[in-house]
Regions:
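N-terminal Sec-pathway targeting helices
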Residues: 2-21
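Boundary/entry segment of secreted carbohydrate-active catalytic domains
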Residues: 26-68
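Functionally critical loop-and-helix segments that line ligand-binding/catalytic clefts
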Residues: 34-44, 50-52, 172-219
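Structural recognition of the beta-strand scaffold that forms the well-ordered cores
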Residues: 38-41, 60-65, 91-95, 121-127, ...
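Solvent-exposed loop/turn segments at secondary-structure junctions
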Residues: 44-47, 67-72, 97-102, 129-133, ...
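Alpha-helical scaffold elements lining the catalytic groove of polysaccharide deacetylases
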Residues: 46, 102-115, 132-149
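Acidic (Asp/Glu)-rich catalytic clusters
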Residues: 49-58, 76-88, 110-119
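Catalytic domains of cell-wall/extracellular-matrix polysaccharide-remodeling enzymes
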Residues: 121-189
């Protein structure tokens, strides 16, 4: 007579197999890494309760919007960066790239805010299709020039935030930079992925990195 109940050992083997399978699936689809470091990115649009974040989170890093285009300076940049530092987070600053503005003007704008704010992580350039015209003959050369200016100033290639994989496809220079991808199921097809933006919680973008130590500036 056979029993409809599995023995204890068989249960353990089956459950163990399911767990391993889920972990493998998660790994290949970008949902699991052996160790991941959680972070957020913020701008003046976000009302951030830093005391609450300090009390209830396991965050390791924070990226703060500094500038956009030629003249826009985020009014909360310095405050956000210093508050993030105060609660023990590593901090990076990012610039929102505009295709219709010369690279040098954008770099000078970013540098002026960078001096005033706190940062100990590699700076980032936010490259999004929304509001930008990448069919403009000057757009790609401007971005390439801006990447070069960042590299010369900070001694490393900037992180490139891309709103979609289509940006990566038509700008091959991205492959030489660490990438910050938004809501992409699998990071395995992009070898240089350094940060993944995975969710939005309470109007704040949540990110994670498999190795945040590699994103630190050498000072």
């Amino acid at each position: 007579m056979t029993s409809h109940k599995l023995s204890g050992m068989k249960k353990i083997v089956i459950i163990g197999g399911i767990v391993i399978a889920l972990l493998l699936i998660g790994y290949f689809w970008g949902f699991y890494t052996p160790k991941r470091y959680n972070g957020i990115d913020v701008s003046h649009h976000n009302m951030v309760d830093w005391t609450e974040i300090d009390r209830n989170s396991d965050l390791e890093f924070c990226y703060v919007k500094a500038t956009e285009g030629k003249s826009f300076k985020d009014k909360k940049c310095v405050e956000h960066s210093r508050n993030a530092k105060k609660i023990g987070l590593n901090v990076g600053l990012y610039h929102y790239f505009r295709t219709d503005v010369p690279a040098k003007s954008q770099f000078d704008n970013f540098k002026s805010v960078y001096r005033a704010a706190y940062s100990n992580m590699i700076p980032a350039i936010d490259v999004e299709e929304q509001g930008n015209d990448f069919t403009d003959a000057f757009a790609i050369p401007r971005l390439i020039e801006l990447i070069g200016l960042f590299e010369k100033e900070f001694g490393c290639k900037p992180i490139i935030y891309v709103g979609s994989l289509s940006c990566v496809k038509f700008i091959p220079e991205f492959w030489d930079c660490p990438l910050w991808l938004r809501a992409v199921k699998s990071t395995n097809i992009i070898p240089n992925t350094a940060i993944k933006q995975a969710a939005i919680i309470n109007n704040i973008d949540m990110n994670y990195s498999p190795n945040v130590r590699k994103l630190m500036l050498d000072k």
